[in-house]
C-alpha cells in the first residue's frame, strides 16, 4: 500500500509510462517509448459530430510536432457505433479527408470493459470513463498525465494550447 501522496504520484507515472498500446500496424509500444515528447491521446471516430476535430488535430501536429508533440489517435466504437470501420478504412478516411499524418493506433474501448491506454487513463483524476469521442489526455515528457479535456474542448482551445506549450517548454 502506498503511504504518501508523493509515492502515489510516482506510482502513477510508472503505470502510465509502462502502459502498453498497439499501433495500427499491430506493434506493441509502451507510452514510455514516447518520453522526451509530450503526448496528446485522443479517442476518435469517423461518424461523430466531433469528427471535424481531425482537421485541427492535424494543424496541432503541423505546428507542434517539431517541438516534441506526439498525437496518438485511438479509434473507438463505444459511443453510438460511430467508428464501425476497419483500421484500413479509418486510416484511409483520415488521410484523404483530413490529411492526417499523426499516429492512428489500434481500435480501443474507452468505457466499460476498457482496453489500454484507457484502463490506465480512466483511473487518473478526474476518475471515470471517457464521456464521448474526442476526449483528450495530455501527457508530459515525464509520462505523467497533465490534464484531461472533455470532448467539447476543441484542439485550439486556449487552455489546451497553453497546457501543450507549458508541457513542451518543461
Question: What residue spans do the PLM features occupy?
Answer:
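Acidic-and-aromatic substrate-binding clefts and catalytic sites of carbohydrate-active enzymes
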Residues: 48-51, 79-82, 155
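N-terminal "domain-start" segment that seeds a small globular fold
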Residues: 2-32, 52
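Thiol-/selenol-based redox modules, centered on thioredoxin-like
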Residues: 116-170
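Short, internal strand/loop/helix patches
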Residues: 88-133
